[in-house]
């Protein structure tokens, strides 16, 4: 395997240290291996006994560590302290006789689960023993090194996803310690009983050799393959104080014979160094910016592994630890701000690599078989242009254009065969927004039908996504010089845009609406997705003003924490996650979902920047509300307002801000925040032109921050810094500085992309190139 590396900076260390806390335990290698059990049972025990994930595949237990006396008796450990930061989890233990031990857990690239130990107060000698229990397999092979330092365990296919598909996993348990320390290993097969990480329940105490450690019993398979295989390594320790004992479980799932491109052991520092640094007068906003940067790497996955060939971001932990289309749009917006474009591009490329023959996408890219992968609507058009604007690449743009063109054809032909310009939703899961009035309005049993496609709803969200995709494909076609394709997508864009404007706008409710499929009558259901047309260039002044009225109405959407997924006056509304009286895991009938909130804030930012289409008063309202909501949105994602405890759960109570902790899924990458800060708070936007160049515009939101600065924003290989102070701000692009006031944009002209330096990886900083500053256009002054 290859490992990229660079020298980490002090700034990255400071950013990691600032996220330290005592109530968290998630660890990941940034490649697909992650230890983040939602409800850990054995968190107070040494090692990794609770399950881990390799991509979508769960496996466990891994291993635990015991302190054992020379005579084989286990020493009770009491965990007295736990300190977490993204790159490690440090636990302190004490024993009844006054010994104190410190364990440092980490998950390193290539699925290496490491437990390192130091101690003080040891009297005499003792042993540290790492051991694991695994389900036997007929073709499993066990190899022990003669020095007793490692056990290789091959061919075990116990890693499974939630749909019971499995892949083989190779495990190697090893020990690192002083060459003089006694080492021993043992593998024993036992009939099944409870599988707890308690030394006294393992088979090893009864085969212990006093003063030597584990007895090297010859492995015997027994009369059948049922039961548990126990693997153990013992290391002798002595001295009042000591260090240097390390146990490591290497779990391998990468394709055999294929060399994986892995980061170095400093991968967390390299990751933070690759993203802009943001500082501001709002401690919560500043902290959360880096917390989202952390979440992106926690959920990063890399191939090659089965169907996954490119780096990407998984939607979350546990069974969400795979690329999913619905959140893929978010990840492309967020990760485009890394110096390296690999993850942003890879997010789309993984779906294109596995595109179905009919042009549709798998909803999830599993490393295992692509069966029952579902389907989700997503805003691929905006995501493609967003990545290309920051990291232009002709080959990627062409690949995206061709693949998304096929997807668009499938979407419009299968979900709008009558060519009405509206896109059909066929069940309540494929929008990612189940259990809400939208679907009940056209199918009274939509909630009970599940994934069965009995619902027919012309969805605002799905139709807006189609409009944005047609617009993006039209723009790319023009840049590629494909006039025929440009003409075709222009017509499609007009057809879909007219349907949104003429059919989906409800003049009575003054809000966009879903449509029933037959007569295309409006359902009148008020939901957060009804504001998604603000992502487009379609709404006029009256429509934007009307939508602002709904968003600021305390009887509809103006809750303390923005934005309820369904209006407060919806007959099914519930703030506490109840649907039909029963608390659900993922209801959308009133809870605040960061996904929809980031959509609507993004729409407000875009309307604020429509200087050529909307009057200043309307734009100002959009900008002020966007800024206020970014602050409230971010503040919501801290446990009880505690600055040290940011989170990102799936959904929240709109009145109290209480997250769905009962669900157990924290650090859910199902929204965007980094992009809102950079494009909204700091006003950065980039628009490519047909000649291959681009215009960089700075237009920060009004009245949100007294002071803020972001630096190391990499735009087409150039370094950008933006600083705002009160109503003044300045931007510097590779030494070229311009100053202005909030409300007056700054622009830089960037030359064609082929003149920009190539960024090879996140650890390498490209040399600076100056952009040409220009005055903003007259209408922006």
What are these regions (language model features)?
Residues 1-283, 606-621, 665-668, 684-781:
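Terminal accessory carbohydrate-recognition/targeting modules of carbohydrate-active enzymes
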Residues 224-227, 267-405, 513, 525-536, ...:
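Substrate-binding groove/exosite segments of carbohydrate-active enzymes
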Residues 232-238, 242-257, 317, 362-379, ...:
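The feature captures the catalytic groove of carbohydrate-active enzymes
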Residues 129-132, 150, 155-157, 176, ...:
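Short, well-ordered alpha-helical packing segments
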Residues 280-301, 335-338, 351, 356, ...:
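Active-site acid/base region of carbohydrate-active enzymes
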Residues 480-516, 546-717, 761-781:
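Non-catalytic carbohydrate-binding regions of carbohydrate-active enzymes
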Residues 110, 188, 202, 212, ...:
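Active-site-proximal structural scaffolding
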